[in-house]
Curated annotation (Swiss-Prot):
This is U-box domain-containing protein 30. SUPFAM superfamilies: ARM repeat, RING/U-box. ARM repeats lie at residues 179-219, 221-260. It comes from Arabidopsis thaliana (Mouse-ear cress). The keyword Transport does not apply. It comes from the Eukaryota. The gene is PUB30. Its EC number is 2.3.2.27. GO terms for molecular function: ubiquitin protein ligase activity. Residues 63-137 form the U-box domain. Pfam families: U-box (PF04564). It catalyses: S-ubiquitinyl-[E2 ubiquitin-conjugating enzyme]-L-cysteine + [acceptor protein]-L-lysine = [E2 ubiquitin-conjugating enzyme]-L-cysteine + N(6)-ubiquitinyl-[acceptor protein]-L-lysine. The keyword Chloroplast does not apply.
Length: 448
């Protein structure tokens, strides 16, 4: 259970129901910024019909004053009650604490001489006032950005040249910053307006802004279908190769969204240009934030044979293998998935086998990251050792494969994974005498 360390509240302890009995002046507290009130005024007029629970959920604020937080749940309190120790909690949470048989104060662990809880009306009113002000301000800002988003959409229908770029840039900033603006753009038919700006003669200045906006929106099937036009995809691929790092990432994310659509056609991503652009992102040592978006796109498109053939032809296999040690767990799993998919075809298996670092790097992964990574690495090793057992099996054993396989077999991994490990272990043992293989396994007794 999370525990909360109370902070010294500089005279704010005296909420009704505990402490030194001081009465907190709400107007002064908020106006003076004691609890982070809205700039420029006191409590103001609050609509008493506003629902506190709804406001807390919709605002989803991070900078909430600590005195509003329940020490048990670490969430804002909606019905604060105070114990005899002077500590305040959310009513529901403290009752759960009592129902578990605890007779102590959760924060101080002080034994309670009275389990009565007193509603802290002063704190409740302060919480309600603070959230109400934030909520009303949010609503006003939302209305402002909604109106501005609609204005910009109207401008885009007739703007040309630099005026169009400026309008798109402003709209991008608005939709990235405001959820309501994103909803408004979609509801007002803005997706079709923005998508129509992508075409064979679209400048990259316009295209990069359009893509940045589109990846921020919740696109429906019709919108994605419209973006699957070859001319639009071609422009997006061009920007994936020639745009800024941010634009390249956005292009990869947008194409990935299209790939996941039911009506997607494999030929749309079966191009040297797309794959070269993605591999550049993967290998870019200056901008590592592009690795994940690129691999997250390579994963779904690698299930298509024509894509796998192109990947082999552009030399993607050794490039993927060589970056394995530098990847974080998520990206490592994606890269191993792609390499395993490439092993589906003979040309892919040969390319994976011929990559000098395939065996040492994949052996290193076994039982070190996740079961999925172990599964993909094991599948890759099986493919290359089966393809060229006399060449690959001894090399794999020399870098510690046999001992790793025994670890997999003895672990709590999936039964199919253990079976594959046993088969690969048997395959590797064929090239050694029993005594020699036992020593390679780092065992002191014969394998039964």
């Amino acid at each position: 259970m999370p525990m909360f360390q109370p902070l010294k509240r500089d005279g704010l302890i005296g909420f009704e129901g505990g402490g030194d009995g001081q009465v907190l002046d709400l107007d002064t507290a908020v106006k003076d910024g004691v609890l982070g009130g809205v700039n420029g005024g006191g409590v103001g007029v609050v609509d008493e019909k506003l629902d506190l629970k709804k406001m807390i959920k919709e605002l989803d604020l991070q900078d909430i004053p600590s005195v509003f937080i329940c020490p048990i749940s670490l969430e804002p309190m909606q019905d604060p009650v105070t114990l005899c120790t002077g500590q305040t909690y959310e009513r529901l949470n403290i009752h759960k604490w009592f129902n578990l048989g605890h007779l102590t104060c959760p924060t101080t662990m002080q034994e309670l001489w009275d389990d009565t809880v007193t509603p802290n009306k002063t704190l409740h009113h302060l919480i309600y006032t603070w959230f109400s002000q934030k909520y009303v301000l949010m609503k006003k800002r939302s209305e402002d950005v909604q109106g501005r988003a609609i204005e910009i959409l109207g401008t885009l229908k007739k703007a040309k040249g630099q005026a169009r770029v400026h309008a798109l840039s402003e709209l991008k900033q608005i939709v990235i910053a405001h959820l309501m603006a994103r909803k408004t753009v979609v509801e007002e038919g803005g997706v079709s307006v923005i998508s129509s700006l992508l075409g064979p003669f679209t400048s990259h200045a316009v295209g990069s802004e359009v893509v940045a906006i589109l990846v921020s929106l919740d696109l429906d099937s019709d919108s994605k279908s419209g973006l699957m036009q070859p001319a639009k995809v071609s422009l997006i691929v061009d920007m994936l190769n020639d745009g800024s790092n941010e634009t390249k990432i956005n292009c990869a994310r947008l194409i990935r969204g299209l790939v996941e659509e039911k009506g997607f056609r494999a030929e749309l991503v079966s191009s040297h240009s797309l794959l070269v652009g993605l591999m550049r992102l993967v290998k870019d040592k200056r901008h590592r934030n592009g690795v994940s978006p690129a691999l997250r796109l390579l994963k779904p498109i690698s299930v298509h044979k024509q894509v796998r053939s192109l990947m082999v032809s552009i030399g993607a296999v050794p490039q993927l293998v060589d970056i394995l040690p530098s990847l974080d767990p998520e990206c490592l799993e994606l890269a191993l998935f792609v390499l395993d998919a490439l092993c589906t075809d003979v040309e892919g298996r040969v390319a994976v086998k011929d990559s000098a670092n395939t065996i040492p790097y994949t052996v290193r992964v076994l039982m070190r990251v996740s079961e999925n990574c172990t599964n993909y690495a094991l599948s890759i090793l099986w493919s290359v050792c089966k393809l060229a057992p006399e060449e690959c099996s001894p090399l794999a054993v020399e870098v510690g494969l046999a001992a790793k396989l025994l670890l997999v077999i003895q672990s709590g991994c999936d039964a199919a994974l253990k079976q594959r490990s046993a088969e690969l272990l048997k395959l590797c043992s064929l090239h050694y005498s029993d005594t020699m293989f036992i020593s390679k396994c780092k065992l002191t007794r014969t394998i039964q």
